[in-house]
Amino acid sequence: MNNDKHKLYMLRILKDVFNDPELSQILAFKGDASLMFFYQLPRFSVDLDFNLLDITQKEMAYQKLREIALKYGRIADEQLKHNDPLVVLDYEKGEQNLKLKLSTRFFDNHYELKNLAGTNIPVMVEPDMFAHKLCALLDRDGMTGHDVFDIHFFLSKQAPIHAGIVEQRMKKLFANYLDDCIAALQTVSTKELMQNVGEFIEGKLKQEMKSGKLIDRTIEMLEERKIVPFITEYPRNRMPIEDVTITHSPEGKNILLAQIAGKSFMEKEISTKEFSIFQALPKDEDRKNFLVHLARENYFDEWQKQSDRNTPSLKR
């Protein structure tokens, strides 16, 4: 594979995607390639991963990605009906195919605009990226070398992590999940990990991966994170949300109800678009996550005022 050529095609497709007035509003860039382009990940990535921010636009986004891919070659494979649409571009015979993947899952992600070759791109922030990468370590059918390598990368640069995403995805406390990761890494085969990452890393890091030193150091740094976790705090994530539901008023409006810290919060009307997204999410877990997101968006200011009133002030 010609890495420079592959990276150039990825760059051109990214520019096409985020210069499109519709796609730029509903897609965000994430995954290994975003780490390579924006966070100096020292290994090569071959696919483009996007989060679909509005699932009601899934078919439109898929068709537009397909049209963009066809500018550069033929479609080697594709799928729309699956929860996560996929377009596989074959841009040249004998070269690595380029996958364009859409994720429809909903988590409490955060994004920031970054510029790439004159194009503004919403990119998942580093703490959230680290969290999803740590989840992927044990969330796949089998542990992969690139996940281990990337986790070592985040730990080595002392990157903060959004622990809330880990707990949301893995359904356990962050510290307990770290123990699971450590236990799994202590038994993994270095030879097996090298099979799917060896060609994408080089030099000293490749030798450390092959010898097992990189895995040992990753375990050591995960142990350190149990003591010094470097957790990124988002103010809205501090809301102790106990229950969120959507009901309908006699006038047909969509009404949000929430129970936060033992108190019922006032009804808030949500938009037709928000209700459509809620209905379109395919999994119960995603709908629950979206309701929590709506509660944080709609009740944060009110909850914060109540919290401030209930917090005793220090007397001078």
Could you tell me what each predicted segment is?
Residues 1-27, 40-41, 52-249, 258, ...:
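Structured mid-to-C-terminal alpha-helical surface segments
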Residues 29-34:
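Glycine-rich beta-strand-to-loop/alpha-helix junction loops that act as flexible
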Residues 36, 50-51:
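General alpha-helical segment detector with a strong preference for membrane-spanning helices
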Residues 36-44:
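Short glycine-biased active-site loop of nucleotidyltransferases that positions the nucleotide triphosphate
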Residues 249-283:
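Acidic, low-complexity, intrinsically disordered interaction modules
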Residues 277-315:
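Mixed-charge, Lys/Arg-enriched low-complexity segments
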